[in-house]
Each structure stands twice: as C-alpha cells, then as structure tokens.
Amino acid sequence: MNSNLILDQAAMPLIMGICCLLPAEQVGELVTVIAEEEGRLGVMSFTEAEGTPHGIELRRLTRLALHIDRHRLDRTVLPIYQGREQLMAGAAALLDEDMTLACGDAMRLLALQLDKLLRGGRGSAQAKLDGLTLSVMEQRALAAQSPNTGAVVRGSWRRKSRNQLGRGNWLDVVEAALWCFWHSDTLQDGEALLGALLGADIRVRVVYGMLAGAFYLAD
C-alpha cells in the first residue's frame, strides 16, 4: 500500500475530525481501515470483521467518510440528482443487517448534511445551520421512510434538551451528534458536550467527529 495515499486520505476533513475524537490506539485502527479500503474496497463485510463492536462501528463509519469524500457533489460528473442518490444510497448500504427504515434514513440524511457542510460556508451559526438544513428538493430526494425522520430533518437537535436524547438506533445517534455539533462553537467544545452526554458510544463520537471535521477542518 502506498503510504502517501494513506496520508492523503488521513488528511481529509472527515477523517481528521474522527482522529481528533479517538484515543491513540484507535487511530492506528482507523489507518488500517483506510489501507484496506484503498486496497480492496467493498470486499470485507462487517459481520466478518474481527474485533470489538467499537471496532466494527469505527470501520463502518470510516468507510462512510471515505465514500462521502469520493462522491461529494462538487466532484461528481453525474447530474446532480444522480450524484445525490449515489451519495445517499452508498451511505445507507453500509448498514448491512442494521437496515431498518429509520436507520436507512439516518445514513442518507447524514450523507447529505456532511456533503453540504463540506461545500458550504464557515465561521458562523448561520453557515452551520445552512449546512444542516435540507432544501425542499433535498428533502424530496431523501425520501424519508420512517415517521420519526421528519423531526430530525426539521431540526429536533436544536430544540431538545440533553436528557431527551438517546442512542437506540442510528437515527438517535445522528440526532445526538447533531445536538453536540449545534450547541458548540469549536470541535473541542463539542467534545466536552459529547463526554457529558454519550461519549462512551463510539457511533455518536465518530459521527460528531465527521460533522466537526466537515465544518471546522475543511480549510
């Protein structure tokens, strides 16, 4: 494996955001995932992956970050509607056995929001809100299947209190990560909120890391 290629991937905003939130021993695991993905993308299933549940989820979300970087809408040669669907469908496909309606919606929504943050403005609450808010056309493209998804799309993470958040499924995970991201002004502030909230859940931690990386580290 070309070490320069791995370093290039590790410098991506989403990957950098994840790295900032991981303990040192898991950063090495992340680099291993990048190497595997560049060498044999799509070959390993998560059910075959060795390691702890934390390791499996880190692998899944690292693959999501790599997928979004490859298929960003400002880099695709596809028509916008096809590029958007490619972005969302590829994200949802990473769920494997976890594919419920709400979980599929969560991954599709997260892919859209990360892409918008990467391509959007910086430095203000309005820029952050613009990156997280779907247009009418984007909501139609999302085509949410779960009745619970609409509240998250409309910004439940702006209004809920800390004790109203959960982590029961992927939609809850995305909502909790969005809450930490919205209620903080720096990556470090969000990390502090994360620790007080659901910091032990690797899924919330890594999703927040991607959101923060897309907004704070993209430049």
PLM features: what roles do these ranges have?
Residues 1-219:
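Structured, active/binding-site neighborhoods that engage oxygen-rich ligands
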